[in-house]
Amino acid sequence: MSLKSYMQLVRIHNVIGAALGAIMGFLVSSQWYLELKGILLSALVVGLIAAGGYVINDVYDVEIDKINKPYRPIPSGKISVNKAKALSIALFIIGIALSILLNIYALVIALVTAIGLIYYAKDLKKTGFYGNLLVATTTALSIFYGGLAFFSDNWLLRIIIPTLYAFFLTLIREIVKGIEDYNGDSLNNVKTLATTLGINKSWRIAKILLVLLLIISPLPFFIGFNLIYLILLILVFIPFTILSIIQKETIEGASKARTYLKISAISGIIAFLLGSLPFFKG
């Protein structure tokens, strides 16, 4: 048992990405008004609840992970199931408690999201596409949550595009993850697009959504985001998204594609964040 094991359990890289999403939502909504309390609180709440969600997901996935990912902290025996449960509960409680310091809307969304993540890990994940939709929704809410923490006039208009991008990119990533986990999911009767429709059809759906995302990706530049957005789009987001699309329609290809999609997601967060700066306009 080590700090490294706990960092792996909470998926610290994904948690940082979620927190950055909240910061981006706040800054875009506030038009880069640097209000430290709102920025830190929104990032902390989102990060803590996301971490709690990842931990509780691993708790319920322990049998599947013994097949798909035996190196993970719980199936490898580095962290016990009981300790993981306690950690998840603590993360959720602290995150919800901190949300009270923002506003009532932030509290409601934090509470609903935490309940949704528990429901997803326990039951909804096994229903397939509906589970994918919930994961995509909660991920996109990290950006929305940051904007809600500022809650100014026209905040919704400013963050709706990055929120939608996060939703669709996460949905695609969940479909690809289902392909990657096909063997373990099949043995444990977990319903995903891959186990329901097959690997090839699931790949096609993911690739169609990725192509559509690529087609509309320049849109934010033409409606107000600055030149930095376009540069990051061309240099990082588009290349790694294309790398995801051209992967072989296999389980191994899905594993590579999911890595590329993580890079696309992080680059997208940075692009929207820097692209909302009030200079370098095209």
UniProtKB/Swiss-Prot annotation:
Residue spans crossing the bilayer: 15-35, 36-56, 81-100, 104-121, 131-151, 159-179, 201-221, 222-242, 260-280
Record's catalysed reaction(s): sn-3-O-(geranylgeranyl)glycerol 1-phosphate + (2E,6E,10E)-geranylgeranyl diphosphate = 2,3-bis-O-(geranylgeranyl)-sn-glycerol 1-phosphate + diphosphate
Q: Cellular component terms, GO, for this chain's entry?
A: plasma membrane
Answer yes or no on keyword Nucleotide-binding: no
- pH dependence of activity: Optimum pH is 6.0.
EC number, UniProt record: 2.5.1.42
Q: Which cofactor does it need?
A: Mg(2+); Ca(2+)
User: According to its UniProt record, where is this protein located?
Assistant: Cell membrane
Q: In which pathway does it act?
A: Membrane lipid metabolism; glycerophospholipid metabolism
- Give the Pfam families listed for this entry: UbiA
Q: Which UniProt keywords apply?
A: Cell membrane, Lipid biosynthesis, Lipid metabolism, Magnesium, Membrane, Phospholipid biosynthesis, Phospholipid metabolism, Transferase, Transmembrane, Transmembrane helix
Chief subcellular site? membrane
How is it placed in the membrane, per its record? Multi-pass membrane protein
Describe the family membership recorded for this protein in Swiss-Prot or TrEMBL.
Belongs to the UbiA prenyltransferase family. DGGGP synthase subfamily.
**Stated role:** Prenyltransferase that catalyzes the transfer of the geranylgeranyl moiety of geranylgeranyl diphosphate (GGPP) to the C2 hydroxyl of (S)-3-O-geranylgeranylglyceryl phosphate (GGGP). This reaction is the second ether-bond-formation step in the biosynthesis of archaeal membrane lipids. Cannot use other prenyl donors, i.e. farnesyl diphosphate (FPP) and phytyl diphosphate. Moreover, 4-hydroxybenzoate, 1,4-dihydroxy 2-naphthoate, homogentisate, and alpha-glycerophosphate do not function as prenyl acceptor substrates.
The name on file for this protein is Digeranylgeranylglyceryl phosphate synthase
Source organism per entry reads Saccharolobus solfataricus (strain ATCC 35092 / DSM 1617 / JCM 11322 / P2)
Upper classification of the source organism reads: Archaea, Thermoproteota, Thermoprotei, Sulfolobales, Sulfolobaceae
Gene that specifies this protein: ubiA-2
